[in-house]
Amino acid sequence: MLRDLQDEIIKLKQEKQAVILAHSYQSADILEIADYIGDSYQLSVVAKDLQQSTVIMCGVRFMAETVKMLSPEKTVILPVKQATCPMAEQISPEQVISFKQAHPEFKVVAYINTTTALKAVCDVCVTSSSALKIVKAIPEQNILFIPDKNLGTY
């Protein structure tokens, strides 16, 4: 039965000229039919260079949002609309705005694993591989790194 469903998805994907991107933590049945597998940033970069105009993002909401930001001309489908990342939901844009108003001397650095709304109110967005280099390049000493405290501590 699962194989039948996978076959139907593959058939529809071909008919619609779509591409399936899957985050590496997806289940094996999804990874088996994915065209590309990777982390959130890798998949966003892959999507940008694809010829297909329809991208099916098997991951969480911020990943689909990031794909759409980097490829605004593409149709991006998130199969499970309520798929969220607990880390991406740890802080709201309103909290960041309030913090920045109370502490204008701070620069707010957001990890890529955040919502589009949160990225929009931050000063810079980084990946795990670019975080250290970018933070070191910020002349201000006061930096709030959100939402990954482990990466921020590094």
For each predicted feature, which ranges?
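Active-site loop-to-helix "anion-binding N-cap" substructures in soluble metabolic enzymes
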Residues: 1-154
